[in-house]
Amino acid sequence: MKAKDIVLKKSEKIEGVEVKGPWLDDAQSLEEVVSYYYRIGFQATHLGRAIEIWRKVEEKRERGEEIRVFLGYTSNIISSGLREIIAWLVKEKKVDVIVTTAGGVEEDFIKSLKPFILGDWEVDDAELRKKGVNRIGNIFVPNDRYIEFEKYMIPFFERVLKIEEKLSRPLTASEFIYEMGRYMDEKLGKEKEKSVIYWAYKNNIPIFCPAITDGSIGDMLYFFKEERRDSRLIIDIANDIVKLNNLAITAKETASIILGGSLPKHAIINANLFRGGTDYAIYISTAVPWDGSLSGAPPREGVSWGKIKAKADYVEVWGDATLIFPILVWMVMKARGQGYAQ
């Protein structure tokens, strides 16, 4: 075979969507630009698929079809400005079940007391420590936020203890968080209206946190129980797993939207295992699969476990959720009439 024949090998005809981006002279809005994402390629195509999947779920729900939407996210999502987007989704009842980590609970409460401050990645962390300033990436959290948080949490623990004594049983973590929402409603001002916990309480949307003690809430519980050695305050994790699994089992269809990895991701897809897998899945992650971690496991790996149905509609978008999620939510919830560019 000649070199030319090798290099210019004849190809078979293939059918498919033409790779094409927006011509900016013609685009009239950001929505029009994003409508091309599906055709751009690479992760833009995956984001386009995520928009398509969530729109399908939302349109079914609007027609009255039962699809229970599970939303999972790690604490850094609430550390960032995505907190307000998630709070809006909860306020508008666009999700039905939430799973997060301890930071995803406590930082939401803290932000209703005092804001986090935009900082920088390249700083002297030893100097920050001297100043009592904690760093989450390029977000600064002065320690006075946690001091203020303690002022609210210690009386809240006393309140929970009275509730548990009245019920003659411990509260589950989801009940504990529900009571936090009630407490916010009673004690805090207007800023609570940007809170996930507050709107979850108002709309009776459960927030599950299997690792509720793995953060500042755990620190406060330590201080509380050390100072009150006879305290019977307990948070029940066991009954929450029953409640979470049953929310999956009893759903006609489920959709799982997961930002990041870790515990929230597995808690949601494992609950869906009990019903034969979730029907729709959107992962947004920067984790890689080659280390075998759950955080990096792609949706198709979940299929092998029965946690995602073999015929499910799913996609993983690799990238920073702070870039991706605002576009995704806007295109699904606010720009519904903007379809794919032809």
Curated annotation (Swiss-Prot):
Name residues in a coiled coil: none
Cofactors that this protein relies on: NAD(+)
Record keywords: Hypusine biosynthesis, NAD, Transferase
Pfam families with a match to the protein in the record: DS (PF01916)
Keyword Transferase part of the UniProt annotation: yes
Q: Which InterPro entries match?
A: Deoxyhypus_synthase_arc, Deoxyhypusine_synthase, Deoxyhypusine_synthase_sf, DHS-like_NAD/FAD-binding_dom
Name a GO molecular-function annotation: deoxyhypusine synthase activity
Q: Which reaction does it catalyse?
A: [eIF5A protein]-L-lysine + spermidine = [eIF5A protein]-deoxyhypusine + propane-1,3-diamine
Which residues act catalytically here? K307 (nucleophile)
> What are the record's GO terms for cellular component?
cytoplasm
* Keyword NAD included in the entry's annotation: yes
Q: What class of enzyme is it?
A: transferase
Copy the pathway line from the protein's UniProt record.
Answer: Protein modification; eIF5A hypusination
Give the similarity note.
Belongs to the deoxyhypusine synthase family.
Q: Quote the function comment for this protein.
A: Catalyzes the NAD-dependent oxidative cleavage of spermidine and the subsequent transfer of the butylamine moiety of spermidine to the epsilon-amino group of a specific lysine residue of the eIF-5A precursor protein to form the intermediate deoxyhypusine residue.
- What is the name of the protein in this document? Probable deoxyhypusine synthase
Q: Which organism is it from?
A: Pyrococcus horikoshii (strain ATCC 700860 / DSM 12428 / JCM 9974 / NBRC 100139 / OT-3)
Task: Name the gene.
Answer: dys
